[in-house]
Amino acid sequence: ANRELRKLNHEHIFIYPFLEENGLNLDSVTPGLQEFSLRYKQDVRLKEVIERLGNNYLSDGDTLLHGDFYPGSWLHTSDGVKIIDPEFSFYGLAEFDVGIMLAHLHLTRQPPAIFELVENNYSKSLTFDNELLDAFTGIEILRRIIGLAQLPLSLALPEKKQLLEKAVSLLKK
């Protein structure tokens, strides 16, 4: 389901951020980020891990996913939280949407209590894979810092470097 938009999203998550020449000068976002990003764009082993993860993303699953589950798709209304922009929805791996959400909690420097709240309130299936969850969390952190889909993050270069290292550690578990 929704194969074309999933392929488009795949390119923006798993391919474009790791091209050395992708049309985005990261120094225009954060001075020094372009050169620092090369360690990820030139890491052959990391790119192999990312390719396998991308294939997992493209595989069919049994969970209906939003497909772009980040704060820009969450609206707080008087009736509670509403989720918008379902155009990337598809049946896939539950770990994907949860990983995207957790990545954005990292990117916005949420306190540990928020992560505990998610852990304690998300009902995981018996087949839920925590390593896959970590990998999807890591790839989203990487793509939002060194990819084309930039966000208005109030993070200095040292903070971005720290998050990038965390992302790689999540991916390479």
In which residue ranges do the predicted regions lie?
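N-terminal secretory/membrane-targeting helices
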Residues: 1, 39-56, 106, 113, ...
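Regulatory N- and C-terminal appendages and interdomain linkers associated
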Residues: 150-173
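Glycine-rich, phosphate-binding/catalytic loops in enzymes
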Residues: 82, 99-101, 162
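Short glycine/proline-enriched coil/turn segments at helix->beta-strand junctions
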Residues: 77-80, 124-129
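Active-site activation/catalytic loop segments of kinase-like enzymes and analogous catalytic loops
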Residues: 94-125, 138-156
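Active-site acidic catalytic loop and adjacent metal/ATP-binding pocket
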Residues: 48-96
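All-alpha amphipathic helical-bundle segments outside canonical DNA-binding/catalytic cores
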Residues: 127-137
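Active-site catalytic-loop/activation-segment of kinase and kinase-like phosphoryl-transfer enzymes
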Residues: 1-53, 146
